[in-house]
């Protein structure tokens, strides 16, 4: 049996060094400030870690097994727990004591015994709906977890309601209606153009299902919703199965193709879809979408080129780095040409956009994101005010980095943006992590409280906040103070 040894890939050095361990820490130390009394609930986070080295030198950061994290806030204290999501893939590799899966999402590069195996890693985000907690990755079905222990319950099709082969890692849980809006892309298998939109009611029962075809089989990492429309952007990061079968990348950048946006009726069917198109571009994450009369605005961290340079053109030619900027894309429902209007909102590079979740799909003022404008590798948490055009930021310090933030309302009916941001921070020079709590309306003032972790929590992708009463009742207690 070969020794376990990771490659010299920079991905596995420094902060990216695999953790490969599960942790339980009760009563984390609060090294600054005090935990707000109203913070009662759990911050769930999900990310990738490496169970075994792949033996390749071209691994990418979005691959790896799901490592699920939770920060539980209870009576002024915070506890931390992390657990592997024991997917079918994880269990196969555990039994084999080595990596069995090759290039990202390319089963033709797997070990022979894993060629036809389920490849889902459940490594991207956390979803809580109708009393159930899930770990998600967009090329597979959800995995249900115990919300208290994080032990894996198992892969699920939600009682037969998921009819596609895949399920998004960016669902939208509306905390006002308690509806779940989700989708599947390449829904009939690798390289298919099929996409499926799902609407589930507050009890987890499927209320609508709409199938249609994309212009090309591509990566659809995120989408957005309004009160009447579901917004699907299609960017030319395309799957060519001939390339995949030859051992190449699952996605390839095809700038000769156009960008397309489909507006799908939230409560209708495929006959009501509206189509728009523009030049080749890309985006990983949507901040929000809003309907304004006959127009639909999509606010997105927009790249004027390829957002995933590790998925180059089919000839392997490198694509130049292009920074993402907060941009508003507008679709006019009365337009005859289907053009997309583009308007940059902020001249500062940013990613991982979030909002006050109560205002997803509704008129809103505040957007939160990671801001990149330092030359020392550090990053900041930002709040953009759409009304004033101003940016408020919190910086953790030289060389330190922030992860995606999570907004928590101060009260169930507090005004939009009145609450806290929970922000995981990488204390790079110390080799450990913090969780900082910020006043969402005054980031520049610094943390309300800082919770110290005595360990390094490898960077996670996305997460969600679940109030304590929601874990027991299955329903969110929120109300809209104003729209």
Model segments located where?
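Beta-propeller domains
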Residues: 1-483
């Amino acid at each position: 049996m070969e020794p376990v040894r990771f490659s010299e890939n920079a991905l596995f050095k420094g902060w990216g060094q695999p953790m490969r361990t599960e942790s339980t820490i009760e009563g984390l130390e609060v090294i600054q400030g005090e935990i707000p009394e109203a913070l009662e609930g759990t911050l769930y986070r999900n990310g990738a870690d490496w169970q075994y080295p792949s033996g390749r030198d071209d691994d990418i950061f979005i691959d790896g097994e799901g490592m699920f994290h939770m920060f539980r806030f209870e009576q002024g204290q915070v506890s931390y727990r992390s657990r592997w999501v024991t997917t079918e893939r994880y269990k196969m590799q555990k039994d084999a004591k080595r990596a069995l899966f090759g290039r990202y999402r390319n089963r033709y590069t797997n070990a022979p015994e894993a060629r036809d195996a389920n490849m889902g890693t459940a490594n991207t985000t956390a979803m809580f709906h109708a009393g159930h907690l899930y770990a998600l990755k967009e090329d597979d079905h959800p995995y249900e977890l115990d919300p208290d222990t994080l032990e894996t319950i198992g892969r699920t099709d939600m009682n037969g309601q998921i009819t596609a082969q895949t399920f998004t890692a960016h669902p939208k849980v509306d905390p006002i209606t308690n509806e779940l809006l989700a989708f599947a892309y390449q829904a009939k298998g690798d390289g298919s153009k099929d996409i499926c939109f799902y609407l589930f009611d507050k009890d987890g029962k499927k209320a609508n299902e709409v199938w249609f075809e994309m212009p090309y089989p591509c990566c659809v990492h995120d989408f957005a919703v309004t009160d009447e429309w579901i917004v699907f952007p299609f960017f030319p990061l395309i799957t060519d199965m001939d390339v995949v079968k030859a051992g190449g990348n699952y996605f390839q950048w095809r700038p000769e193709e156009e960008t397309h946006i489909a507006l799908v009726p939230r409560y209708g069917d495929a006959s009501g879809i509206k189509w728009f198109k523009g030049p080749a571009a890309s985006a990983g994450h949507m901040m929000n979408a809003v309907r304004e009369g006959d127009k639909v605005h999509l606010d997105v961290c927009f790249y004027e080129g390829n957002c995933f340079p590790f998925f180059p053109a089919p000839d392997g030619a490198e694509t130049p780095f292009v920074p993402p900027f907060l941009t508003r894309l507008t679709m006019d429902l009365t337009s005859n040409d289907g053009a997309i209007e583009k308007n940059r909102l902020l001249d500062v590079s940013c990613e991982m956009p979030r909002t006050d979740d109560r205002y997803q799909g509704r008129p809103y003022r505040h957007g939160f994101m990671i801001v990149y404008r330092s030359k020392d590798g550090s990053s900041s948490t930002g709040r953009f005010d759409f009304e004033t055009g101003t940016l408020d930021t919190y910086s953790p310090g030289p060389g330190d980095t922030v992860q995606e933030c999570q907004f928590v309302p101060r009260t169930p009916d507090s005004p939009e943006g009145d609450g806290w941001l929970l922000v995981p921070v990488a204390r790079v020079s110390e080799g450990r992590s913090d969780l900082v709590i910020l006043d969402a309306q005054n980031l520049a003032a610094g943390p309300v409280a800082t919770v110290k972790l005595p360990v390094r929590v490898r960077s996670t992708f996305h997460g969600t906040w679940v109030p304590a009463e929601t874990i027991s009742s299955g329903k969110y207690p929120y109300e809209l103070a104003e729209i």
